[in-house]
Amino acid sequence: MERTLDIAIAGGGIVGLTAALSLHAAGFRPTVYEAVSQLAPLGVGVNLLPHAVRELSELGLLDELLEIGVAIQDLNYLTASGELVWHEPRGLVAGYNWPQIAIHRGQLQMFLLDKVRERLGADAIRMGQELVGVETVSQRVHARFVDRASDKDTAIEADVLIGADGIHSAVRRQFYPDEGAPRWNGITLWRSTSPVVAPMGGKAMIWAGRSSQKFVAYPIGKDPKTGLDRLNWICDLKVTDDGAPPPRDWNRPGDRADFLPRFADWRWVGVDVPAIVAASGPIYEFPMVDRDPLPQWTFDHVTLMGDAAHPMYPIGSNGATQGIIDARVFAWHLAKADSVEETLRCYEADRREITARIVLMNRQQGPDRILDLAAERLGNGSGTLKDLLPMAEREAVALSYKQTAGFDPATINSRDSFSVF
């Protein structure tokens, strides 16, 4: 493919910035259009699975990521009383050739932003540009943006436009105007970080409880003020029926009083949920939402990527991971294909079906289903967890999700690289 193509990326989040770096590595020079006027290191933690870390490693970013994140070594599923349901090694310890990295989402975004400016130049990112219209005319994309500072329209043309602008994607809305709000499963998440000594050795992930009431925690680095571990934590509670309209006010400040009483006695060896929550900074409240899988991502020379294409519940650590893989696959196809049309066709064929399967599996709780199985068996039967939920059944749940999502070690370690050169 001609390396002089005009490529526009709507969205300067993790996926859009990874797409820019991937396209640059393949010999192209894209331009990123971001709606906010200034990016800031916002958010809490995110997990990057080994197949996403592989892609960032091949972009030359691994060593620096390990300096600001944590290489996770194991995952532990616990009952609400602290009994171990399932343990498995993660990352390099599990036999992958790349680690699993837990990192602050905002730090990751700012790191990628710096790399885009360093490699592509400061003018590769246009801030404060809100997309308001897009169409393809004679094999050229015509897009309109509103400058948030001046309120003036800006018109651009490109050979291809990537919509990587998140779950509320303006690009997606151009082609699915009647889709409406994201789908809420009735679960609310309260999230924050706390400066504490991370439990279970300092490089472990903890999933405890069941889908209707769950605690998740993992370290994402060091707290700059105290030098302690920066522990990302999430408390989930089912608050209404599946399919109810989601709250209008997203990512709003959370109140401990709304959830902490339900976790008041969640104290186990090395894990004290009330103490962890009490030590936190600001708490944020989110609805757990996704969208139905789409029948089509690509319209003429416009396509979708990341959460704009396949937003999913934050289960199984696959949200950012799948978006990063989208970006790398797209860049590889653009470099190898004979036309933009072939690129878009192959990209969607490679990515749409597998991400749709993950979205639907996450609605069934994905690997976290093992917690519901344990809670149901213990609640309905008499006996030990060992007898009520055989280890072979637990292993089958974990393996099934890895195989469906394409991240069992054999698959990741043996597949060909998406690097062009």
PLM feature spans:
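C-terminal helical "tail/cap" subdomain of flavin- and related membrane-associated enzymes
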Residues: 2-5, 67, 82, 295, ...
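Conserved N-terminal glycine-rich FAD pyrophosphate-binding loop of Rossmann-like flavoproteins
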Residues: 37-55
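Conserved FAD/dinucleotide-binding core of flavoprotein oxidoreductases
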Residues: 84-109, 113, 146-156, 195-285
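Conserved N-terminal helical subregion
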Residues: 2-7, 51-176, 180-191, 243-245, ...
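Acidic/histidine metal-binding catalytic segments
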Residues: 67-68, 124, 265-281, 340-345, ...
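Conserved mid-domain beta->alpha element of the FAD-binding
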Residues: 8-27, 31-36, 162-163, 190, ...
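Short, solvent-exposed loop/turn segments at secondary-structure boundaries
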Residues: 43-45, 100, 246-251, 315-319, ...
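Catalytic P-loop NTPase motifs of RecA-like helicase/translocase cores
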Residues: 39-40, 170-171, 311-313
